[in-house]
Amino acid sequence: MTDVFKVLTPAKNINGEHTHVSMGDTKGTWYLSLNKSQEFYNVYGLALKNGQKLSLAEKPGEYVPLLVDIDLKKEVNGYPNYGSNDFYNDEDIINVVKIFQNAVSENVNRHAKKLTNKNLRCVVLEKDIFIERINESEDKYIVKKGIHLHFPHLFLPKKDIKNSFMPVVKTMIDQENVFQDFINSMDNQIMPSSLIDDISSKYWLMYGSSKEGLNKPYKISKILDHNQQEISISKCFKSETCIDGSPITDTNVEFELPMLLSINPKPSIISNKLFYFKEAPVKLCDALLPVVNNNREKEGRMSSREIEKMKKLTSFLSVSRADDYNQWWTVGITLFNIGTGRDCEEEALEAWKMFSSQSTKYDESRCDLEWAEMKKKNRPLNARTMGSLIFMAKSDNPVALEKYLLAEQMNIENWTSHQNLDVESIKKLKVPVFDTEIAEMFVSQHEDEYLNGNLGWFKFNGTIWSSLESVGRHMRPSLVSLSRSYLNLIPALKYITKTLQNDDEGYEPSDSGFGFDDDDSASTSGGKTTAEITKLVNSKIKLINDLAKKCQNNGPQMSLMKVIEDMIGIDNLNDKMDQNKQLIAFTNGVYDLSLFTFRQGLPEDYITRQMTIPYDITLTMENPKVIKMLNFFKKIFPDEELFEYFMLENCEMYIGGNRDKILQIWTGEGDNGKSVTNKIIENKFGKLSVKFPKGMVTGDPPKAGACFPELTRAQRGVRWAVVDEFAPDETVNAGVIKNLTGGIDNLYARDIQQKGKDVIDIDPFFKLIFICNTIPNIRNPDNATWNRIRVIPFESTFKDSIDDISLEEQKRDKIFLKDTSFCEKETIRELGEAFAWYLIQVFIKKEQARRDARLNGKSFKIKIPAKVNEATELYKAQGNAIADYFNDKFEISDDDNDTINIKLYYQDFLLWFSQTHSNKNVNIDKKKFMKLFVQHAKGDMNTFICTKLKLKETLEEFNLENNEENGMPLF
């Protein structure tokens, strides 16, 4: 299959985007570009014709042909001698096809497009019976027969097939009792629908391909028309064309089958065969269906001037945006929201097509297809509007945009010099007079650039909204620039009057030097006398000079900024900023975790904090930076299972919230990499990470409305919160743990300067991490507390020298040479960049698995390594150890003379714990033991004496007096 791979592009070269996956000896994912389709199918067809084994599968897109997998298998005693007819008969296949055709006819929406008989044609594909011995010791076999149904002329939305259509069809199949002979031959009775699988979301083997090993490909056994009558292959595809555009014939149709049966053909082919379902006949898993909002408010239809502005702004966008799918789609969804929100959808789609046509990849039907999907969801993404277009245009073509916006605001066009400014332009020229007019012009020119509210002033820097200490320092230059743009018109205005004066016979200037005498009978221009035109020009010049005074003097500037503040101010800005859990900002853009897309930041993201590193889209698993980072973490976690778990758990750090409600406790002796690991994470997060004081989790939670400044630091999108350096005798509050690791209710806090009524409602975005050598005990834990805790052991040790340690000992004890470069700022930053990229890749795979599980109605959980479970269980045992020891050894007494001196029982406690916990050692020192025991027994904290307490009578006495002599010190 070497020649086939030469045509395809390895997915790793284009950031993982792929259309095909190899299921044979050569593993990998690949991308087929449209401009190489003809070459690919020719090479693939020739390889198939020459008998080469092929193992390529296609990745399904958002729209797929209706595909059905019928999986017949059963267990038999003795080697079977089966043929196809022993499994099913033709009537079974015909009945199943008929059920699907009827279901399509009843449930497909016919309003937009007519459903024809051709759309109902079904290709039946089969492969030979496969026999597999269960094990060598028994003479039992599994017999399998695979059948695929493929409707090549009918494309449908993938998720609707899974969520709405297949459940309905399966019900119909059970009612018809198909495959009854096969079911009756089985030991266990099953429902017919259990034989039918929906594979719309799975990779689909190309025609002629098979999996590795002895597997054979599926072949066409028959094709059924809309009446379930057999037709020839050439008749089925008669109206199609070959990959080179020539017509399908009896002689070439076999060669073209891999292309004709592709589940991911050209967008133009999908568009012609695409249908949508009516409203689902059965509401299944409503939470999984797309949210549809058919009542979106519209602002009223755009004026023709605004539509032209939309098209003009789109024309300023860079061609590179049209070549990059993510940016191309962002432009599309922006125009879609403008079009549907302002009742100019047709014009918005036209603007998108004009923009897209600049790319060599342009396919008009692809625009129609994507637009139809946006319309079906009818859900604006971050409510992108004209401001987003302006921002993108400003990034791509700032000079042209500035000239255009200025000309638009002045109500003149194409002014580049005095020659372009004629009398008509002077009459149309708008010069703002009042503060409100100037402010409106400023806001229009700087749309979505400034923001003001209860959090202060912000300016959009291209990625996030940056907080401004002094808004005047930023606005004043813009106001001055606005006035100078008008002042630059004065020479052109004067040129007009000068030209008229030179043309006027007997002209004499007035005393003012600007106008004409009242009795001037000069020539006319455009129906007006020279005097009238000069008067008009002078009035415009006066207005411009007045504007300049307001924009360039401090007092009027302050007044203007106050008006601008009122115009762009947003109430409760705190409720908007940093509230999207799916967005995380890097220094060079924003990653959208819901779409697995890295893109340019937009004003409507409302992000005010970003990480300190860029997201490097050029990284691959073979990049030296990534290899170095992985080598570092594999020394931290030499155990492969522990390494994978650490990555799977922490790839969630970028998404806001703690949806799995996990508290990670990193523990281990010193010099094992905990601090360096956390330093890498904190360094890349910057202001998105906080360090909580220990008292926040060891003390009681504050009362409602009380001052709690520590928690207020964790608002505004903070993703990472750490508590470290616990003392051995400190105890953590279980209630605080549950509050901070995510629950139904938000957290409430008040900063030092805030009034009680200004309490902040905090939706925690952070993951909570404890870092400690000795794990603190938990006060009054319940099952909900323990279910949240994951103790992650850092097993390695990093030493300054390992010369005297054998290689065997190093490997066994996980000892490594300490690399001091990991403490250097540049190394930490480099590791952070690679780590950030790698975790995003892990997150994508994990999230896709989570979504697939949700669609199938299953729960999703990652496997917890045995070492984490053991460490967590040991911690739990230690947390309950005092109470268990107390209950095992002691009992309450009514006699005041019954006393217990806790100092004497520490060694007995250690022995008891070892005996009751499989010889494990408890991580509780004597001081901590005495304190916890006295607390539990309600004894005297000064003397460590507990009254009305005695040993249980069933226990044998032991010699406490001689403990010290026997090497068991009391202190």
From Swiss-Prot:
The keyword ATP-binding applies. Residues 624-807 form the SF3 helicase domain. One of its GO terms (molecular function) is helicase activity. Its EC number is 3.6.4.-. The keyword Hydrolase applies. InterPro entries: AEP_C962R, Helicase_SF3_DNA-vir, P-loop_NTPase, Phage/plasmid_primase_P4_C, PriCT_2, Viral_Helicase-Primase_Cplx. It holds the Pfam family PriCT_2. It is an enzyme of class 3 (hydrolase). ATP binds at residues 668-675. Keywords: ATP-binding, Helicase, Hydrolase, Nucleotide-binding. Residues 506-528 are annotated as: Disordered. Belongs to the IIV-6 184R family. This is Putative helicase 184R. It comes from Invertebrate iridescent virus 6.
